Amino acid sequence: MASLPVLQKESVFQSGAHAYRIPALLYLPGQQSLLAFAEQRASKKDEHAELIVLRRGDYDAPTHQVQWQAQEVVAQARLDGHRSMNPCPLYDAQTGTLFLFFIAIPGQVTEQQQLQTRANVTRLCQVTSTDHGRTWSSPRDLTDAAIGPAYREWSTFAVGPGHCLQLHDRARSLVVPAYAYRKLHPIQRPIPSAFCFLSHDHGRTWARGHFVAQDTLECQVAEVETGEQRVVTLNARSHLRARVQAQSTNDGLDFQESQLVKKLVEPPPQGCQGSVISFPSPRSGPGSPAQWLLYTHPTHSWQRADLGAYLNPRPPAPEAWSEPVLLAKGSCAYSDLQSMGTGPDGSPLFGCLYEANDYEEIVFLMFTLKQAFPAEYLPQ
């Protein structure tokens, strides 16, 4: 299977004096710009994460190219004595506030150490910007207020990674996907379950939603309309050789109908993070969904390789996912997607930031729906 033609493919973060992992991408439509985030690490190891870095990309519509500016450190996104991980950006379109959520972990304490000792030392943090990421606030530790007593019931937790979601409910609620390793048994290994952090007051206060099925880890959420109902669909990494999908009809508080989507394969033994977004359907008419879903993930069933895109034109139906189209051949891992409006061929435009070349670089891809799924795209 050959890789599809794309509008742009460019390396945004490259290993050298530092390694870069865990991409997160945010499109700001009013600015026609992208913010690409990643962890800067001393090496590829998780415990060698240090800071969160950012590159700004300006989309030039006449040339259909993104011009990337120099790399900068989000210096405020850290707690003293901690390393910053899992960048999760979110733009509140109603207030103009840009949030960057992340987790902070002391020194080089690993996830495995927290699972073995059953001692949770991870903190949930945010910084905010009111000038589209040019300057940032001091860090705010949300852990105690957002999690409360349940913190002691977890061995560790994380957010995202990747973009978060603002809903189209009356409150324009903010949703931050997450997962926690819960100590459900006094002796057995803690079990991971996905959930969401929720704010109904533009980030002033935060609540914790209920857990999805067990054995769900890194996840992302998207909002779709099904008839008269808005649904938040959650797509999670699992150890079960396939993705887990679940739906919420109360804005991410509760998730029902957790399903294993066998078409969305997970490479053994631990699976891999993936990205999901909704975007306006190119089809109109009675019975046509208002949004479709796009999902990116390694397509190889045995290893982290061959980045693919999957389309769901009847969301959130798990059986409606397409076969994948190949975005990039070879080694790949984590990715993050953004919808960027309309492309030069009149079909929806997407940006994808993904890990490539055995974690040696993080690459930006830009492509249209018509390039990826020509048979599916019908002009209005």
Curated annotation (Swiss-Prot):
<dbReference type="GO" id="GO:0006689">
    <property type="term" value="P:ganglioside catabolic process"/>
</dbReference>
<dbReference type="GO" id="GO:0016020">
    <property type="term" value="C:membrane"/>
</dbReference>
<dbReference type="InterPro" id="IPR036278">
    <property type="entry name" value="Sialidase_sf"/>
</dbReference>
<keyword id="KW-0677">Repeat</keyword>
<comment type="function">
    <text>Exo-alpha-sialidase that catalyzes the hydrolytic cleavage of the terminal sialic acid (N-acetylneuraminic acid, Neu5Ac) of a glycan moiety in the catabolism of glycolipids, glycoproteins and oligosacharides. Recognizes sialyl linkage positions of the glycan moiety as well as the supramolecular organization of the sialoglycoconjugate. Displays preference for alpha-(2-&gt;3)-sialylated GD1a and GT1B gangliosides over alpha-(2-&gt;8)-sialylated GD1b, in both monomeric forms and micelles. Hydrolyzes monomeric GM1 ganglioside, but has no activity toward the miscellar form.</text>
</comment>
<dbReference type="GO" id="GO:0006516">
    <property type="term" value="P:glycoprotein catabolic process"/>
</dbReference>
<dbReference type="GO" id="GO:0004308">
    <property type="term" value="F:exo-alpha-sialidase activity"/>
</dbReference>
<dbReference type="GO" id="GO:0046479">
    <property type="term" value="P:glycosphingolipid catabolic process"/>
</dbReference>
<dbReference type="Pfam" id="PF13088">
    <property type="entry name" value="BNR_2"/>
</dbReference>
<dbReference type="GO" id="GO:0005737">
    <property type="term" value="C:cytoplasm"/>
</dbReference>
<dbReference type="GO" id="GO:1902494">
    <property type="term" value="C:catalytic complex"/>
</dbReference>
<keyword id="KW-0963">Cytoplasm</keyword>
<dbReference type="GO" id="GO:0005764">
    <property type="term" value="C:lysosome"/>
</dbReference>
<dbReference type="InterPro" id="IPR026856">
    <property type="entry name" value="Sialidase_fam"/>
</dbReference>
<dbReference type="GO" id="GO:0005829">
    <property type="term" value="C:cytosol"/>
</dbReference>
<feature type="binding site">
    <location>
        <position position="41"/>
    </location>
    <ligand>
        <name>substrate</name>
    </ligand>
</feature>
<feature type="binding site">
    <location>
        <position position="179"/>
    </location>
    <ligand>
        <name>substrate</name>
    </ligand>
</feature>
<dbReference type="InterPro" id="IPR011040">
    <property type="entry name" value="Sialidase"/>
</dbReference>
<feature type="binding site">
    <location>
        <position position="181"/>
    </location>
    <ligand>
        <name>substrate</name>
    </ligand>
</feature>
<keyword id="KW-0378">Hydrolase</keyword>
<keyword id="KW-0443">Lipid metabolism</keyword>
<feature type="active site">
    <location>
        <position position="355"/>
    </location>
</feature>
<keyword id="KW-0119">Carbohydrate metabolism</keyword>
<dbReference type="GO" id="GO:0009313">
    <property type="term" value="P:oligosaccharide catabolic process"/>
</dbReference>
<feature type="repeat" description="BNR 1">
    <location>
        <begin position="127"/>
        <end position="138"/>
    </location>
</feature>
<keyword id="KW-0442">Lipid degradation</keyword>
<feature type="binding site">
    <location>
        <position position="304"/>
    </location>
    <ligand>
        <name>substrate</name>
    </ligand>
</feature>
<feature type="binding site">
    <location>
        <position position="21"/>
    </location>
    <ligand>
        <name>substrate</name>
    </ligand>
</feature>
<feature type="binding site">
    <location>
        <position position="218"/>
    </location>
    <ligand>
        <name>substrate</name>
    </ligand>
</feature>
<comment type="similarity">
    <text>Belongs to the glycosyl hydrolase 33 family.</text>
</comment>
<feature type="active site" description="Proton acceptor">
    <location>
        <position position="46"/>
    </location>
</feature>
<feature type="binding site">
    <location>
        <position position="237"/>
    </location>
    <ligand>
        <name>substrate</name>
    </ligand>
</feature>
<keyword id="KW-0326">Glycosidase</keyword>
<protein>
    <recommendedName>
        <fullName>Sialidase-2</fullName>
        <ecNumber>3.2.1.18</ecNumber>
    </recommendedName>
</protein>
<feature type="active site" description="Nucleophile">
    <location>
        <position position="334"/>
    </location>
</feature>
<feature type="repeat" description="BNR 2">
    <location>
        <begin position="197"/>
        <end position="208"/>
    </location>
</feature>
<feature type="short sequence motif" description="FRIP motif">
    <location>
        <begin position="20"/>
        <end position="23"/>
    </location>
</feature>
